């Protein structure tokens, strides 16, 4: 029918003819490169194309071929020789003409329309604009209908008549040779032969041929006979279920489709639909299948199929299973701060919330703090005051292991404003390979054991637990004459082995050596009860490990007065008086009672004091 002189690239498949069969487009442009590009776009859009580089050749093609050979002409405005306007005037309305140019000039657009062009396009044209040029052909066909026919038709009938006017003729009937008859299958073969010999329907939308037949019948007796396609449409039976049909997909390419079941569109799960699904799932408690869930979702106004619900249910159950496995893995992890039972640290499992003292005025001093179970059994009380909380136990190893293993779960116990700062309180070498008491510095700045500080910042023994430290550690120094003790945190300590090592030869005793960092095989617990005779003099100081760093009597006096505020001493107290300083000592059975309100530095009337252990009196 049409001349396809455009080169189709390899691999490109031309679409099938639409409801016009295939519109034939005559393209005219003196730019050969753009002409080939435009021809290719038209071919891929489903049109038959003939291209010419001059208006003279295009006019010659229109004159030589029948009237319906070209359905539309596309021409450039500016061409050498005969331009687009000259070609438009020579065609004289026989074929609809679309004019195009590079410039989008309003004057040019108005001029082309006023001269009879059906449309004006700007170069370069897009494939979307090319695809819908069939609308101009349809509009031109509608305008060409007879006046008497158009007045008696509805708007929909106008469209049907225009389509019928350009409908292609039906293809010739296919005649197949008859196959040799076989016994038993004659009736079936005759039926198949009759079906093959029937004429296939033309590719015309439903209702178009009937409307066209009505148009031709209304022309009267003097009109010519309708085309064969229209006459055949008037006699054609109505379409049955399952028969092929033609559908318009937004372009002129209408393909014949069978009466198969239509594919449902894909359902997109949104937040609203998923919320309704979860609500239905939880209401049924996973006891019903997709059918019940679908019914509950329909109550919320969400309509889905059973297959869609089943697919979403499988995905949701898989997601729940993965979340459950993640939760189990997290809860069973040994590093999980919330998993106390699975922790491998033995010391950690023995820490609990309880109180060291269960009776008396100080029963609530340590209430609500993590306390080791051994703190109440061995009599050696060690405290560490931190910003996160006070930990009370028997030794620094327990505290260090507890803090270093679980500092991320219970808050950082080693850090700023903490008495333990990147070093162990009672160990030889810290976790970062530093001596705990290198160069005489016990811990952090402002510690109770450095620079002679009386314990204003970072003090090891706090006010609220001093009495318990005294009662737990003091009896180890009783029973022998006491001499002035040396500093507890000096460079003379042998390899800094012990933080509380007694360097005074007068008070040195196998049982009074280091109670925590034991470097002597003969040493014992500091809590072993020993009798100590209290000495007298201006330099008398009790060798209390918990009161390390008190290098002068003034600091000692200030600290003791600040700690023993009120009635805290009772009978069984031995007081050593040297005029300006008093020191206290208790045996293992000493009762912490009350202190006279005058304080420890005031002069006592009687210089005779009774030893709480053996009742011996001590001289002034």
From Swiss-Prot:
Q: What happens when the gene is disrupted?
A: Dwarf, narrow leaf, lesion mimic, low tillering, altered kernel color, viviparous and low fertility phenotypes.
Instruction: List, alphabetically, the InterPro entries matched.
Output: ARR-like, CheY-like_superfamily, Homeodomain-like_sf, Myb_dom_plants, Sig_transdc_resp-reg_receiver
What SMART domains has UniProt attached to this entry?
REC
GO terms for biological process, alphabetical: cytokinin-activated signaling pathway; phosphorelay signal transduction system
Q: Which GO cellular component does the record give, naming just one?
A: nucleus
User: Which PROSITE patterns does the entry mention?
Assistant: RESPONSE_REGULATORY
Q: Where is this region: Disordered?
A: 171-197, 215-257, 431-457, 501-523, 596-620
Which residues are recorded as modified (4-aspartylphosphate)? 76
Stated role: Transcriptional activator that binds specific DNA sequence. Functions as a response regulator involved in His-to-Asp phosphorelay signal transduction system. Phosphorylation of the Asp residue in the receiver domain activates the ability of the protein to promote the transcription of target genes. May directly activate some type-A response regulators in response to cytokinins.
List the PANTHER family hit by this protein, alphabetically: TWO-COMPONENT RESPONSE REGULATOR, TWO-COMPONENT RESPONSE REGULATOR ORR27
Name by which UniProt lists this protein:
Two-component response regulator ORR27
């Amino acid at each position: 029918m049409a001349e396809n002189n455009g080169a189709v690239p390899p691999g490109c498949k031309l679409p099938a003819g639409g409801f016009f069969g295939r519109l034939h487009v005559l393209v005219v442009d003196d730019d050969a490169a753009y002409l080939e590009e435009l021809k290719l776009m038209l071919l891929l859009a489903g049109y038959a194309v003939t291209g010419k580089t001059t208006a003279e050749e295009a006019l010659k093609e229109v004159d030589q071929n029948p009237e319906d050979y070209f359905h539309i002409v596309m021409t450039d405005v500016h061409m050498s020789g005969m331009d687009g306007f000259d070609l438009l005037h020579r065609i004289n309305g026989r074929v609809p003409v679309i004019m195009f140019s590079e410039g989008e000039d309003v004057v040019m657009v108005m001029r082309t329309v006023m001269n009879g062009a059906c449309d004006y396009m700007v170069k370069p044209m897009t494939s979307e604009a090319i695809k819908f040029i069939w609308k101009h052909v349809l509009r031109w066909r509608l305008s060409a209908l007879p006046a008497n026919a158009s007045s008696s038709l509805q708007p929909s009938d106008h469209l049907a008549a225009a389509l019928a006017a350009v409908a292609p003729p039906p293809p010739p009937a296919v005649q197949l040779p008859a196959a040799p008859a076989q016994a038993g299958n004659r009736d079936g073969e005759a039926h198949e032969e009759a079906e093959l010999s029937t004429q296939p329907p033309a590719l015309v939308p439903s209702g178009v041929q009937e409307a066209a037949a009505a148009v031709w019948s209304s022309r009267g007796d003097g009109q010519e006979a309708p085309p064969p396609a229209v006459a055949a449409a008037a006699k054609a039976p109505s379409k049955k279920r399952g028969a092929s049909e033609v559908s318009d997909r937004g372009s002129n390419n209408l393909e014949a489709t069978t009466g198969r079941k239509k594919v449902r569109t894909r359902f997109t799960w949104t937040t609203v639909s998923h919320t309704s699904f979860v609500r239905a799932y939880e209401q049924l408690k996973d006891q019903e299948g997709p059918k019940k869930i679908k019914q509950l979702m329909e109550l919320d106004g969400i309509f889905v199929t059973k297959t869609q619900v089943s697919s979403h249910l499988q995905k949701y159950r898989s997601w729940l299973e993965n979340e459950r496995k993640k939760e189990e893995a997290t809860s069973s992890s040994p590093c999980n701060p919330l998993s106390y039972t699975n922790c491998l640290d033995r010391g950690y499992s023995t820490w609990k919330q309880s109180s060291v003292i269960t009776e008396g005025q100080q029963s609530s001093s340590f209430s609500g703090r993590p306390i080791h179970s051994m703190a109440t059994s061995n009599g050696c009380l060690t405290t560490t005051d931190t910003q996160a909380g006070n930990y009370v136990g028997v030794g620094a190893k327990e505290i260090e292991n507890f803090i270093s293993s679980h500092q991320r779960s219970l808050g950082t116990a080693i850090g700023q404003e903490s008495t333990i700062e990147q070093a162990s309180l009672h160990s030889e070498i810290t976790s970062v390979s530093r001596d705990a008491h290198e160069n005489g510095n016990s811990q952090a700045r402002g510690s109770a054991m450095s620079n002679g500080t009386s314990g204003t910042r970072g003090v090891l023994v706090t006010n609220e637990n001093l009495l318990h430290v005294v009662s737990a550690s003091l009896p180890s120094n009783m029973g022998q004459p006491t001499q002035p003790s040396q500093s507890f945190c000096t460079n003379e300590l042998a390899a800094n082995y012990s933080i509380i090592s007694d360097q005074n030869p007068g008070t040195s005793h196998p049982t009074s050596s280091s109670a925590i960092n034991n470097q002597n095989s003969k040493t014992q617990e500091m809590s072993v009860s020993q009798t100590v005779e209290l000495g007298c003099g201006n330099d008398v100081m009790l060798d209390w490990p918990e009161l390390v760093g008190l290098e002068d009597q003034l600091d000692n006096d200030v600290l003791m007065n600040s700690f023993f505020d009120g009635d805290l001493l009772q009978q069984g107290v031995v007081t050593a008086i040297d005029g300006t300083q008093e020191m206290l000592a208790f045996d293992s059975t000493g009762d912490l009672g009350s202190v006279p309100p005058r304080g420890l530095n005031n002069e006592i009337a009687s210089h005779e004091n009774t030893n709480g252990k053996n009742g011996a009196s001590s001289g002034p």
